[in-house]
Amino acid sequence: MAMNKKIAVVIGLSILISGCSSANKEKNYNFIKGLNEYQKNDKVSALENYKKAYEIDKNNVVLLNEIAYLYVDLGKYEEAENYYKKALEVKPNDENSLKNLLQLLYLQNKRTEMEKYIPMIIDRNSFVYNLNNFRLGILENDEDKVEKSLLKISSNDKFLEEYNESFYIDLASVAGLSDNTIKYSNIIFEKAYRRYSNKNKDIVKIYANFLIEIKEYRKAEDILMKYIVNNENNLDEYVLLKTLYTKENNKQKLENLKKILRNKK
């Protein structure tokens, strides 16, 4: 799941640490203890302490999201779903709860559930709303829905506010769906590449893969070569170059690449 733990901790502390009653103090103590255990990767102890805090305050949206997030980390998706839904019962239309729940539903191919919760997103121009309609289109194999969602995403830079790797992987997966999906995906990838490529290797690889799939070989080669020149740890990029040259049957460049790789050993 793509939730930022550092942000969650800051928000959690600011919301949970309130009041001075003994019950509040006990809740805060258990929550902070749970956070500390989680940071040490002791997920079982973290969950135990979160649950103690939950027994004191069952209506805290941040705490409910933290418990759900931990259940996802433990691979217990049904339990996670339940806690995200509890958070939405307390605070309907909470975007963070909806975002995390919809991500989880998508991972499990739960289309009917996604259809239920997507309309609860208030801002119809938000990235979260358009992202989940795009994903629903993928699950339903609905080319029109995919195209319309990508058009909206590509026309608004909100998707750049937070790096979402799973979105770019999904984007690359629909490369061959239609000319329009290629057009809109290209716009999105170009913006993401400009924003993230200096500090994020993964966007370079995903974008290059996309370009190779749509047979934009020279453009793919260009971004891979730029990365290789500026970075030492670049074996993955060499592998992608090999894939590229193999697909376009460029025997001369393949031979040159083999020589470079032999010299790197």
Sequence positions of predicted segments:
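Register position in tetratricopeptide repeats
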Residues: 39-40, 73-74, 104-108, 139-142, ...
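Structural marker of alpha-solenoid helical repeat scaffolds
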Residues: 56, 90, 123-124, 156, ...
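Residue-level recognition of tetratricopeptide repeat
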Residues: 60, 94, 126-129, 160, ...
